[in-house]
Amino acid sequence: MEIVIGLLLSSLSLYCDFTDAECLVISPARLVVKYGDPASAKCTSDQPKQLGWEATHGGTGLTDKKVKFLNWSVDSVTDWNIKPTCYTEGGQCQKQLDITVYKLPDSVSMTGPSGPMVEGKEYEFKCLIQKVAPGNSLNVSFYKASAIGRKTKTLLYAPDVPRQTTKEPISGEYPLLWSPSRGDDGAQLWCSALLGLGELGPQPPPEVESEPFKLTVHSCSGQAAGSAMVAVFLLQLIHWL
């Protein structure tokens, strides 16, 4: 008998957990919103209940009457950690809206060697990205194109971006170690910051690029010839003296 009662109580508990989890539905279930843009969602109950929204912006108290739905909306999303939650009287059932707030970087720039480069020698470039969010959606890439233009761009390198737990804007420097060849003289190098926000995010994914860095590459043979000419000139000068 005790076993039967235990099974009944267990079944009832599972039923209650299921109904509590399913008693509220938020649509859309997930939002991707640009910082400063409006946002809205609808909370629906399976049965008429007193509903409310708890949020740092756009929150409401419980409705006076039992209703089957209640809307949440804000004119401008300005809280990076906003967690709008729909709930029923007594908090017996609640559901949180999954919302991602994003922001394009304030600036994307690239630094590199200040003077001409020599083919085959390794140089360091850096992509500087200022205040972009969320950091865990950031993808950084370095590209190269011929002197003609960017139509034939080639991906040089995509550095690993450390995964971020914060939802607030981040800034970072992302390095590239690269050795140019003789054919890279006159080519352009630049980097980009792309936010991969998934299917619900803007399509194509928003991307901000740096200004191009024009490459000046000297060949080893050219340098050797130049050095030889200087040496000959110095020898002749010494002979004349």
Residue positions per predicted region:
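Solvent-exposed loop segments of extracellular immunoglobulin-like
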Residues: 47-57, 131-146
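Solvent-exposed loop/turn motifs of extracellular immunoglobulin-like beta-sandwich domains
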Residues: 2-6, 33-38, 65-68, 75-87, ...
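Proline-enriched interdomain boundary motifs that mark the N-terminal boundary
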Residues: 20-27, 104-113
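Short beta-strand segments of immunoglobulin-like
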Residues: 28-33, 111-118, 130
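Solvent-exposed serine/threonine-rich low-complexity stretches and specific carbohydrate-binding patches
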Residues: 57-72, 152-167
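Extracellular/luminal immunoglobulin-like beta-sandwich modules
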Residues: 85-105, 187-218
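N-terminal Sec-dependent signal peptide, specifically the hydrophobic helical h-region
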Residues: 1-31, 35-37, 41-59, 80-99, ...
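Core motif of extracellular immunoglobulin-like domains
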Residues: 43, 53, 86, 127, ...
